[in-house]
């Protein structure tokens, strides 16, 4: 099967490619591509990758009209555009090719996360080996919850892991090295995450929970 990831930030694209390699995907029968759509003709590039057939499913993760138009343009026959990222602007709109809705069976769906059954399925998949560590970019304690929740739209990165029995400011994993210059705990956590390709991991979690007074 074909899977293409696009973004306009090359650093993010490179990071994703280092975590989820094309070789690993190929071993599971997936033809994985990473494409920077910030330059050139992204529609032509993506259509070429698909062999000119377009895509069965296109997931739009940002409420940007130009991105929606690109997604619409690369749908294949009976293709589904999944608008995942909900906009804040109640007047948000974007052009959509309704000729293809009628003649090419294109359709649109909006999702904003999963239900309880989806969560159960996700937990089951994790138990079977799916690793969610690549999603986590920040670690914090219970005292960080309020500010993190209120300022979430302004905090970059991915998921924030909160340990409710710890007192710890929300801390980016990428900041461990700098913090480790003055706090040995963070130096040790930095060593552990670097040993796991920069990812939060059970070893680091165990160490953190065993040294709550050193945060």
Q: Which stretches of residues belong to each language-model region?
A:
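Short, charged/polar "capping" segments at the starts of alpha-helices
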Residues: 9-16, 90-93, 169-171
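Short beta-alpha connecting loops at secondary-structure transitions
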Residues: 83, 103-111, 133-134
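Short, acidic/turn-prone active-site loops that include or flank metal/cofactor-
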Residues: 8, 38-39, 85-89, 113
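Rossmann-fold NAD(P)-binding glycine/threonine-rich loop
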Residues: 65-69, 73, 85-105, 117-122
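Short, well-ordered coil/turn residues at beta-beta hairpins
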Residues: 57-62
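Mid-domain Rossmann-like dinucleotide-binding core that forms the NAD(H)/NADP(H) cofactor-binding site
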Residues: 1-37
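Glycine-centered, small-residue-biased loops immediately flanking beta-strands
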Residues: 79-80
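C-terminal hydrophobic helical "lid"/dimerization subdomain
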Residues: 15-27, 39-48, 53, 66-73, ...
């Amino acid at each position: 099967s074909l899977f293409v990831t696009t973004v306009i930030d090359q650093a993010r694209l490179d990071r994703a490619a280092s975590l989820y390699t094309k070789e690993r995907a190929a071993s599971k029968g997936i033809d994985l591509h990473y494409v920077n759509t910030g330059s050139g003709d992204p529609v032509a590039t993506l259509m070429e990758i698909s062999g000119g057939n377009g895509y069965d499913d296109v997931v739009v993760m940002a409420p940007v009209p130009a991105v929606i138009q690109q997604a619409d343009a690369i749908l294949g026959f009976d293709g589904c555009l999944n608008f995942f990222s909900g906009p804040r602007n109640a007047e948000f709109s974007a052009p959509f090719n309704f000729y293809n809705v009628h003649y090419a069976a294109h359709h649109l769906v909006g999702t904003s996360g999963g239900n309880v059954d989806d969560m159960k399925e996700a937990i089951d998949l994790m138990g079977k080996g799916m690793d969610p560590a690549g999603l986590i970019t920040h670690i914090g304690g219970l005292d960080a919850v309020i500010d993190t929740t209120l300022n979430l739209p302004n905090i970059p990165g991915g998921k924030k892991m909160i340990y409710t029995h710890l007192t710890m400011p929300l801390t980016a994993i990428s900041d461990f090295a700098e913090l480790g210059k003055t706090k040995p705990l963070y130096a040790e956590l930095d060593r552990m995450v670097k040993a796991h390709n920069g990812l939060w991991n059970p070893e680091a979690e165990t160490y953190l929970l065993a040294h709550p007074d050193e945060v």
